[in-house]
């Protein structure tokens, strides 16, 4: 069983990801991360999964999540994942980032495009982009 955490689970991409993962027998979602709905049941926000989910939404603590999840999905705006990821987190878990934080290999292009400073350029070279 693959233990998965989703940071940004109540946004459009995160909720769709949760819906898809809930259909798999080999995945257990152990963390529904949401800044807006901390403490509220995920199923009260998305009624279509009420019969399958009885977990509350938790905060966006990637450090804590990395201690219990095999894989962390971040379905968050640009800048979030890069600002949170550390070498310690990467030594414990895999991260699949749905934003563009590690999509572009050129930090200057990223910073020009998104108008933010990339917080973890040291991880760009080892990141893998998949579509």
Regions found by a protein language model. Name each.
Residues 1-131:
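N-terminal Rossmann-like NAD(P) cofactor-binding subdomain of oxidoreductases
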């Amino acid at each position: 069983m693959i233990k998965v955490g989703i940071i940004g689970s109540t946004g459009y991409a995160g909720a769709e990801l949760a819906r898809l993962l809930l259909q798999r027998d080999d995945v257990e979602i152990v963390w529904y991360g949401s800044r807006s709905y901390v403490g509220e049941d995920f199923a009260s926000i998305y009624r279509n999964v009420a019969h399958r989910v009885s977990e509350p939404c938790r905060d966006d603590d990637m450090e804590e999540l990395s201690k219990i999840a095999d894989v962390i999905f971040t379905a968050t705006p640009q800048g979030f994942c890069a600002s949170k990821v550390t070498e310690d987190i990467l030594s414990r878990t895999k991260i699949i980032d749905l934003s563009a934080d590690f999509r572009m290999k050129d930090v200057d292009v990223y910073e020009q495009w998104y108008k933010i400073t990339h917080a973890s350029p040291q991880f760009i070279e080892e990141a893998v982009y998949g579509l």
